[in-house]
Structures are given as C-alpha cells and as structure tokens.
C-alpha cells in the first residue's frame, strides 16, 4: 500500500515538474522578447531568420540557442542573482563579470601563442595618483562601495594577459597593418582605499606585462600615467565601470602623441550632458542609496568634423542603419541606458566616414570602453571601421581589404584583456577558433 502511495506521489511530482517545464517553455516562446540587457549594457541576440542557407551555412541552430538563452523569461533577474551569489563565495580571476573581481593574483602557465620581444623601456619620472582616504567601504555582491562610489575589483590572470598580447601580435602579422594597442586601467587602480589593496590585482603590473609581451613593431599606447595624473578629475563614473568622456579624451591625447598627431583641445568641443546616470555597478549592487543620491552626469563631446555613421549586423552585411555619434539628451530623456549616448552604443560593426582627406583609414577593435573614445578619432581619419569583438562574426579580413584599411587600434579595458571568455570571443571574431 505504501509503495503504491509512493509511486503515485512520484508520478504526481513528475507530472507537476513536466507541466512547469512546458509552461516555462511556452512562456519563453510567446512572451514579448526584450532587446536590451540593462544589467550587461548590451543588445540581446535577435530572433534569427530561417532559410536553407542559414540552416546549413550560417550556424542557424547556434543563433537560435543564443536568442533563446538571451531572451529567457526573468533572465535579467537570474543574471543579477548569479552575480550576487558569486560575490558571496568569491570568483576566480580568469573570468569577467560585471562587478565581480578576483581576490588573488593567479600564477598560470604561459599560453602557447607566441610572445613578442620585450619593448625598450623608457625612463620617465614616476607618476602617482592623489592620495585616497583609507575609509571603510561595504562589499555588495563582489563590488566594493565606498561612500557614493562603486569599485569593481580586478582579477589579474597572467596567463590571459599574455594571451591578449599574443592575439595582438598574431593579428599584426596576419594582416600586415600598423597596429596600436591602448589598454586602460579602471578606477579601482586609483580609488581603492589602502585597507582593501590586497583584494584587487595590480593593474599597472598587468599593463606592464602586456607591454613586455608585445612585438617591437606594435605601438603600445601607455595611458596608465595620464589616468593616474588626472584621477582627481572626473575621469571615471562613480556608478559605472566605464571611464567618462573626459577620461577617454585624455587617452585619445596619448594616442595622438604616439602617432605624431595633434589632439583637438578639449575646450573646442561642444558638450551634451545626460543626467541622472546610474550605471552598471549601481545595478550590480542592487541599488545603493548613497550612489543614487549623487548620480553621475554623462558628458558627450560632440563630433566637430562632418561625418556619416552606419551600424551593421553581426555579420557586417546589409546597407547599415544610419545613426549618430553624439546623442543629445532629449534622445535619451526617458531611457536608463544613457551610456549609448557615446557612439550610439555597441553595434557589432560600425563604419564612420568623415569629410577628411588624409588617406588614413583605421580599424578599431574594442568593447564598450571604446564607445567614448572612438568619436575623437574623427579628427584624423577618413574612415573609422569599428568592430565590437564580442558580437561581430563576419569576415574582418574582407573589411580590411575592401575598405583599404591602413592601420588598426585595439582599445580595451584591463578587465576585458585579462578575461579568458573575452579572449575566446576575440579569437572567434578573428576566425581563429569555433
């Protein structure tokens, strides 16, 4: 008798579980699909269009899988909860998560990608950032909140940093382009109170490792010192993991110095202020009263050179969507996603055509940190081809050949350069892995 009751209970439980799976599956198909992730600050995978060609030649099943997982009901809440849980138990540094950093310096084996010859060292006076008060903060889901500022702790993986430099070296050899690299530190390098220094990796050491691993023909744009020098200014957001437009400008100045170009004066730009801005780290901690009480202002420096910009899909095909590089406040008045005011967000591929006549065309390989930086390049190039390596899956060699690209620039932030999942994406984008 007991066995029959047990069997009936098991059957009822199985039926209930199956019904829940069917209901959730049905909801995930028929509910309205989101198109943007506020937590991750990115566009979500669009619904793929079926065709025989797509099925056999364009990885249609993979696109369906990505679309389904990206638009699953409650995904945003689940991602936020996962971030919080990871923060409670600590996360290793060979991965990247919004607001979750490593608490140790990983000593990994070297990568198999070829390492370049160390570059010659230059002697320069040491630059130090202003002294940071050694005040107490609060850990929230892997993010350290100090007063009204959220700090994303940094995980230093030597293995992945070396891998990043190897990818750049291989790219330059493959395409024969004059190649530059600009990797920026984050605010935790300059704003972390002394009592928490052991909880975050040394970003300057990581940047020096990149420099030492790059081939001698690679132009390494060293921006650590200028970011340290200006760290007392508003060069990083308090509620977001990105630099501000001003921070990106100072990096642009260093790029110009390294290339023999004259940077446009900061005061020559018209500005648009988007406020209030509460960014990725504010969302990662689930909201914080002190941060909310003193929100960021996102300042856009308006492009001065006449231009057109077209955004393209992941494979780089189609006619492109014409948009703007400098969005006005009224365009985003009712939007929380004000970071897209820089270069209209993170399209997989964008082509900017200016009215310059320099004969120079540049390919920029970046993630979201490059959005605030790229518009400054319009002063110096006829065309700027911008690839977000996280999303683009087209033929980058075809773009280089058909556009007549003359040089390339990698613009990345140190957390992305040291994250294996991001390096996987970069290699896939370059067609070096599946």
Which role fits each region the language model picked out?
Residues 1-434:
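Extracellular glycan-modifying ectodomains
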């Amino acid at each position: 008798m007991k066995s029959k009751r047990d069997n009936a209970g098991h059957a009822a439980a199985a039926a209930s579980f199956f019904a829940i799976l069917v209901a959730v599956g049905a909801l995930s198909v028929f509910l309205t699909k989101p198109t943007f992730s506020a937590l991750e600050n990115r566009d979500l995978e669009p619904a793929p269009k079926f065709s025989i060609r797509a099925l056999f030649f364009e990885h249609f099943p993979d696109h369906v899988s990505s679309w389904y997982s990206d638009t699953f009901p409650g995904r945003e809440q689940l991602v936020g909860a996962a971030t919080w849980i990871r923060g409670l138990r600590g996360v290793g540094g060979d991965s990247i998560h919004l607001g979750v950093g490593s608490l140790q310096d990983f000593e990994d084996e070297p990568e198999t990608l070829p390492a370049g010859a160390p570059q010659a060292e230059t002697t320069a006076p040491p630059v130090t950032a202003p002294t940071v008060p050694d005040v107490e903060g609060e850990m929230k889901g892997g993010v350290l909140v100090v007063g009204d500022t959220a700090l994303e702790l940094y995980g230093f993986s030597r293995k992945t940093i070396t891998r990043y430099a190897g990818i750049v070296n291989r790219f330059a050899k493959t395409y024969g382009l004059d190649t530059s690299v600009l990797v920026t530190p984050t605010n935790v390098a300059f704003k972390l109170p002394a009592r928490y220094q052991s909880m975050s990796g040394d970003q300057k050491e990581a940047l020096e490792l990149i420099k030492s691993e790059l081939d001698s023909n690679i132009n390494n744009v060293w921006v650590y010192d200028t970011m340290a020098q200006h760290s007392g200014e508003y060069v990083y957001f308090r509620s977001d993991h990105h630099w501000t437009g001003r921070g990106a400008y100072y990096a642009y100045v260093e790029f110009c110095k390294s290339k023999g170009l004259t940077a446009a004066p900061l005061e020559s730009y018209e500005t648009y202020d988007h406020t209030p801005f509460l960014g990725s780290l504010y969302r990662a901690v689930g909201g914080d009263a002190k941060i909310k009480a003193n929100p960021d202002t996102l300042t856009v420096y308006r492009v001065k050179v006449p231009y057109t910009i077209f955004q393209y899909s992941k494979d780089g095909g189609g006619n492109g969507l014409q948009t703007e590089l400098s969005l006005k406040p009224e365009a985003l008045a009712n939007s929380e996603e004000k970071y897209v005011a820089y270069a209209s967000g993170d399209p997989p591929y964008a082509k900017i055509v200016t009215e310059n006549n320099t004969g120079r065309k540049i390919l920029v390989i970046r993630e979201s940190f490059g959005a605030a930086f790229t518009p400054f390049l319009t002063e110096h190039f006829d065309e700027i081809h911008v690839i977000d390596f996280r999303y683009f899956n087209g033929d980058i060699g075809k773009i280089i050949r058909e556009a007549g690209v003359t040089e390339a620039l990698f613009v990345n932030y140190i957390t992305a350069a040291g994250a294996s999942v991001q390096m996987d994406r970069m290699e896939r984008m370059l067609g070096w892995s599946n």
